Design a protein with these regions (language model features):
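Helix-adjacent hinge/juxtasegments
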Residues: 65-106
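Hydrophobic side chains within well-formed alpha-helices
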Residues: 7-10, 44, 83, 106
Length: 172
């Protein structure tokens, strides 16, 4: 498998996993959705806001070289409907971006400033892998918070995504 094929598979997984978390979050009451649970961004709502903010900000870095909207501003998106809309838009833009990639672009180095303004540079494939891994971390925190509320969600392991995808290919 090439780097490009791997990145495409990881971004398919990332979108699927985000959608499963959003679907599970839709079964929470408003209180449960915003309840402080001790996760990095306090609540299911906060974690989802952070995940989508990171996706949007990294995409902006990759396409324009800068953050057009500060992470803190994007994280102010509140309510499941608004978050769902933000995720849908970020997934659409990420699909377009991933479709435009080639191996040369993935191996290319991108200079950028992080959310604290620190300058760094990394190969695109590392940055893109980071975004998926970052989302996995915060989805796991979200799953833990939901389990603590007695509302566990489905397995989000990558292998289950591939098993489901293989089944869909056979069935359909």
């Amino acid at each position: 498998m090439s780097k490009l094929e791997l990145i495409r598979a990881l971004y398919d997984y990332n979108e699927s996993a985000n959608n499963h978390v959003l679907e599970a979050a839709s079964r929470l009451s408003d209180d449960e959705f915003s309840r402080k649970q001790g996760a990095s961004f306090e609540s299911v709502e906060g974690n989802l806001g952070h995940i989508v903010a990171a996706q949007m900000n990294w995409l902006e870095r990759w396409t324009s070289g800068k953050n057009l909207m500060p992470t803190a501003e994007v994280q102010k998106i509140r309510g499941l409907g608004a978050l769902r809309g933000a995720f849908d838009r970020s997934h659409e833009l990420l699909r377009e971006f991933v479709a435009s990639l080639n191996e040369e672009r993935l191996d290319g180095v991108l200079a950028y400033r992080d959310s604290r303004g620190k300058r760094d540079e990394r190969p695109m494939w590392q940055l893109m892998t980071h975004v998926v891994n970052h989302g996995t971390h915060h989805r796991a925190e979200t799953a833990m918070a939901m389990t603590a509320m007695g509302k566990p969600m489905r397995e989000l392991d990558y292998v289950y995504f591939e098993i489901e995808r293989d089944r869909d290919r056979v069935d359909g």
